[in-house]
Every structure is written in structure tokens, then in C-alpha cells.
């Protein structure tokens, strides 16, 4: 008997009642399930129409291909070829798997190295901040002189409120700095070169050439910049190249308290103004919301990061004011030539005519330490946003001095060709732009060598002051010719 479908001897023969043909049981059942018909006659057929055939057990005959030696050799050759092909495929798969595993191991090793480096940098930063906190909290009797600190009225209440605000602000900002790692994504040689090759656009011109110009970008939107030229206070809208005179009197100093509030110092008072700025443009400033009377002319004015206090300096005194009254003043036995507040707000530094830098605790007015002296009067001071760098320039030196507050030492001098005219450190503390009046320099901090590398030197003459506009990736500078220009 042979199966009508396969033509081979069936193992389980059955006969179809419909056609009378013999089939292999598994084959005919599959056909009926799919078509419900007999495969030979195409008549309707069900599984009940299949009748099993009982036959004695027998040895199935060999197929024709295995009945002769040549046929067997051919069969063996085919089997060998199949084994060889399968072995080749297995070897190829093994090679690919090894390559994938090797790539994965290299990627894992690189990831572990990056994690290790980042962990090390994090630990170094934490250790540096801890050392810095210890340094500013330790008062050395050999280096600290007793200062005359005069408190205002209601001493206890003022001191408690000031201390609480300073400590709260310090905790918030220092912890935020530990979590946030700022990187200048645009600080590449090509990007800086493209910035410096741009044609400067004029925002303002025909200013008095004998007076200096100071810039104060808004803390949240550097498109708006306060500009103090002589005793005239303007606000510059960088995006639209427009200006607005926001104060009619003679301004001696100014600063932003918040993005919508400014402080302006005159000869007899410090006035607080609401000054909302938005994308719709500049708005006029109304009457001051509060006014603080002062006894001496204020040369420098800085806002505490909380926006609730002001730090000021006259010729020989440093002051702290709330937005309503004076909290205390410190008498310094030297002429004060510059003032800067730490980004965390827990201390401030005064640059003196004798070249010294004196650090004071904001909450109490106690002197913490002093650096220097430099060889000439301190000209400008700027803390880095990383919390531990202090950039210093002097009147007569051609070097920019970088102090490290963690180590309480001068870590680097950046030389220029002639006396430093202006300097500005960007928000990442990794880009430093400066000018000696004839050349514009851009330096970048290289962490591997812990030094500053000069990225570019561009001839831009007559620069008297400059500042980074961080969000815009632009530079704003004034010239001795009485113009204010934007680069980028």
C-alpha cells in the first residue's frame, strides 16, 4: 500500500469512505482540516469518513536513493556539505558575537571611566567647597584686624533678620551649585572665532569721551543691561538696540535687586524702583517704592543674592542696607576702590588703594581674612560663579590675577601686553575676556593642566569696559570714543 498523497508506505494507513483511496493518517487529517475535501476526488469529506487499516508491523523499505553504493556516497556527500555549511555559519555567528561582546566591553569600560572621572570631580568640588567654607569660617588673629562695626537701631532684630536671610540664601545657592555643573557648550575655538569675526553693531554713540561706562546685565535676562555713564543711568535693550533713560537725577551707582527691581544711589539716598522688563520692550520707571537716607557719597553698590539687602561702599566705609534702612557699617582704614559680593551671599570683598583684598562676613560685618597686597590699587573684582575663583585687576599692572578662595592663594597671573583696561568672566567660570585697550583677548580654562589658554587675540582698539551677555553668547563693550557696541 502506498499513500495517495506522498507516494510512500504509510505508517498509519487509513481508507477514505468517499474515494476508497489509502492515505497516511496525519497527512489526510491535515488536508481535511484545511479544505474539508478528499484530495483526490475533491468530494466533501470529514474525519469520520476515514477508516483505519490494521496491518502487521513491517520494516519500511529503503528509499531508492539508499539502495546502491553510488547513491549512498552521494547521500553522505550531501550530509557532509550540510554539516560543513552549518559549521561555517556557526563560526561566522561566533565571530560576530565575539565582536559585539568586545564592543560592549569597551563601551562598558569607557562608561566606567567617565563615571569614575565624574565621581572624582564631584568629590573634588565637594572637598573644595568644604575647605572654602572652613577657610572663610576660621578667623586668624594674625591676619585679621579689629574693625569698627556700627549697628543701626534695633540691633537684635536687624541682626537676626540679616543672619537668617544670609544663611538661608547661602544654603540654597551653595547646594544648587553642587548639583548644577555649568558647561559652555559654545566655548569652542570655532565658536569664539566666529563671535570675534562678527561685525560690531552700535547701540549708543556720542557719549562723553572723558567718562567711564559701567554695565550691569539683568540677573535673569542679559538682553536688558543697566548702563551708568558719568551720572546718567540708562537701560539698554540689546535685542532691539534701543535705550531708555530711567533716572532723571545724578546717579552715582546702581544694581539689579531682582529682574524687575533696581537700586540707584544718589548723593543723599539709595532709592528702590520697580522696573518691569519684558519682551514687549522697556517701560518707564515711576516713583521709588522706598528710599534709604545715607550720610556719605556711595561709590559702589551691590545687591545681595536674596534681593533683600544691599551692600555699598563709600571712600572708607562698607555698608549693609535692608530695603528700608541701614543695618551696619564698617570703617576700613584705607580708601576703597572696588567692591564685590560672593555668589552665595555669605561674604563680600573690598579692594583697597594699597592693593589689599579684605573679606568680610555679610551677616555680622566681621573681617574674615585678607589677600595681597598687590603692587597698585585694586581696580576691578569679580567672583566666579563656581564659588571659589576671584578675578582681580589693578590700576597699573598688565596682569589679570586669579585667586583661589579654597587655597587662599594666588593661583595664576594672565599677562596682557599693556595695562588691563577691562575684564569679564562668563557664567561658567571657564571663559575670560579681557582688553588692554588695543587687543581683545579670550582665554579658556583647561582643567587637565589647571591653567588658562589664550583662544584668541583680536585687534579691537579703545575698549574701556566690557561684559559677557551670557544667554545671548555676545559681548557688550564701551569705547573711549564714546560708543557702546555689541559683538556677536
From Swiss-Prot:
* Class of this enzyme: transferase
State the family named in the UniProt similarity comment for this chain: Belongs to the WD repeat PRP19 family.
User: Which locations, inside or outside the cell, does it occupy?
Assistant: Nucleus
For this protein, what is any one GO molecular function term? ubiquitin-protein transferase activity
Q: What is this protein called?
A: Pre-mRNA-processing factor 19
- What's the short name of a Pfam family annotated to this entry? Prp19
What are the annotated GO cellular component locations? cytoplasm; cytosol; nuclear envelope; nucleus; post-mRNA release spliceosomal complex; Prp19 complex; spliceosomal complex; U2-type catalytic step 1 spliceosome
EC numbers for this chain: 2.3.2.27
State the disulfide connectivity: none
Q: What is its main location?
A: nucleus
Known role: Probable ubiquitin-protein ligase involved in pre-mRNA splicing. May also function in DNA repair.
**Which gene codes for it?**
prp19
Does this entry carry the keyword Repeat? yes
What processes does the entry annotate via GO biological process terms?
A: DNA repair; mRNA cis splicing, via spliceosome; mRNA splicing, via spliceosome; protein K63-linked ubiquitination
Q: Per its UniProt record, what Gene3D superfamilies does this chain match?
A: YVTN repeat-like/Quinoprotein amine dehydrogenase, Zinc/RING finger domain, C3HC4 (zinc finger)
Indicate the segments forming the U-box domain, all copies.
Answer: 1-71
Q: Which UniProt keywords are given for this protein, alphabetically ordered? A: DNA damage, DNA repair, mRNA processing, mRNA splicing, Nucleus, Repeat, Spliceosome, Transferase, Ubl conjugation pathway, WD repeat
Complex and partners: Homotetramer. Component of the NTC complex (or PRP19-associated complex), composed of at least CEF1, CLF1, ISY1, NTC20, SNT309, SYF1, SYF2, and PRP19.
WD repeat start and end residues: 331-370, 373-413
Reactions accelerated catalytically: S-ubiquitinyl-[E2 ubiquitin-conjugating enzyme]-L-cysteine + [acceptor protein]-L-lysine = [E2 ubiquitin-conjugating enzyme]-L-cysteine + N(6)-ubiquitinyl-[acceptor protein]-L-lysine
**Pathway info:** Protein modification; protein ubiquitination
